[in-house]
């Protein structure tokens, strides 16, 4: 929202600084050379963004007078946009460097690694993420530490342990039966999944993630094979929504995708083997598609040296090309496709590399940025908090020196990061 009258400055700034007793350092003004409107896709030149504490209080024409008391951040030579968001991360995991690390690290050690990964993600310009799958509620602990200001990192919506069937993608299947290995989220049957969701809610999760099909990085599961019955999926969705939690369904295979959409999930993760009917079903029900179209390149190039078994590399080969075709189909049909990368499969902090792939496989640069800002905010239900540079929203702001609408790869290395009014990076 823009304001072009001098009176507004007097009301918003001077009143805040004097009548309300606000300290001068609480007011920051960003001078933006170009400002991207994530809702309309328009770009406006020479804009002032006024910030009080952690919120944006005004967006004004650049010729308005700035009070002497305000701190000024000069980004007049930069392209300014909302902090971007990634809807599929594993910030407490790091398959990219060591496929078997999870078998040798304690949850405590993995959570400490998550602190490092969270900071890398924030410094890449990702001010909000969804973490979809973490045992022992490691992601809950990390989210809380970030929210309490103890460590730097993005805003996090977290799922805790992912639900899955016995022996499915969300179970642990690599060791023999004498180890009696079982993932935290394994639950079979409609009442068992309800109990698991209630437990997750008890320990503070923001959403539910479950595995509706097999996957790439699990042993012994076919990528497209459907897991969970419709009855079980409907129980997962009903129980989650009863508790005000949205539902993300890991689903590669088309039948599992359709079953999850019918059950009422909020997002389909991966969505590798889509057909037109599945896309239409999702569009009719308002389902989001969260499709990771960069990580295949990393896995095929570096997976073997990082210990990824040949079985899993072969499954990645099976999925990669087809998933990108599905991405193009969903974009062309007008589905809600959000930015989601599966970080942890590739190195944390490289999330921005997916923007160029999104454009290569069908999005315009504007669509690619919106998929990581206004559209992701809609999926989270946080439209009144993040996803745009507007009055009342968190001051989550990034900037680059080039124009990402001309060269989307500019977003692979951002120059400025602010989250909640605090500057974390400024080149």
Roles of regions detected by a PLM:
Residues 93-110, 166-181, 216-230, 285-320:
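Active-site gating loops and adjacent loop-to-helix segments of metal-dependent hydrolytic enzymes
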Residues 95-99, 218-220, 257-263, 293-308, ...:
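Histidine/acidic-residue-rich catalytic or RNA/ligand-binding cores of hydrolases
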Residues 144, 148-162, 224-249, 286, ...:
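Alpha-helix-loop-beta-strand connector modules within alpha/beta enzyme cores
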